[in-house]
């Protein structure tokens, strides 16, 4: 991290990292204490009151952030020949089948999302050991195994992200970039939180939103007050 100026140090010292802030305040603080030459990502960590070891408490799905993440996601579509034109016209970065399966088997994973078709999954399945650990394995639950290729590609390009609790019950996601307006970051964060609330498992007991933290790629985390209703 670059050496802080006197003004930057003063701003950082004003932030009480033991305190919880309203969502808008937390966003503003993270923007102020981020000093990088690149447009850092602003990430949210939401600790849910679930036990991911139980199948009925595995929270995962997708959400379309109204202002996107600020990142142009590289999409690979593995499809049959008659779907290739549709995929390209929708904005897919890479389109094909056997040639890309071979490339992946040889170690190529320079992509962010893979979209495929149900009838192709038998071939894609053998890539599980490579794609699974990287979070790239297509899944019907996240809309990446579908016959509606164009719709799936357009959704990802317009800001659709996947979320999934880790083994500690925490959902990690990007809600935009430091350069975004405070309002855009707030809208994105609220959309994710609203989606997580709707996805609350019926078997989850006690407090559901246990804690929320915001941080940029190079900043400390700022806690968000979970006692507010966030406007919904």
Swiss-Prot record:
Keyword terms of this UniProt record: Repressor, Ribonucleoprotein, Ribosomal protein, RNA-binding, rRNA-binding, Translation regulation, tRNA-binding
Record flagged with keyword Nucleotide-binding: no
MF GO annotations: rRNA binding; structural constituent of ribosome; tRNA binding
GO cellular component, one term: large ribosomal subunit
InterPro entries in alphabetical order: Ribosom_uL1_bac-type (IPR005878), Ribosomal_uL1 (IPR002143), Ribosomal_uL1-like (IPR023674), Ribosomal_uL1/biogenesis (IPR028364), Ribosomal_uL1_3-a/b-sand (IPR016095), Ribosomal_uL1_CS (IPR023673)
CDD domains: Ribosomal_L1
SUPFAM superfamilies on file: Ribosomal protein L1
Gene3D superfamilies according to UniProt: 3.30.190.20, 3.40.50.790
Disulfides per UniProt: none
GO BP term, example: regulation of translation
Task performed by this protein: Binds directly to 23S rRNA. The L1 stalk is quite mobile in the ribosome, and is involved in E site tRNA release. Protein L1 is also a translational repressor protein, it controls the translation of the L11 operon by binding to its mRNA.
Subunit description: Part of the 50S ribosomal subunit.
Assigned protein family: Belongs to the universal ribosomal protein uL1 family.
Database matches in HAMAP family: Ribosomal_uL1_B
Protein name: Large ribosomal subunit protein uL1
Source organism per UniProt: Amoebophilus asiaticus (strain 5a2)
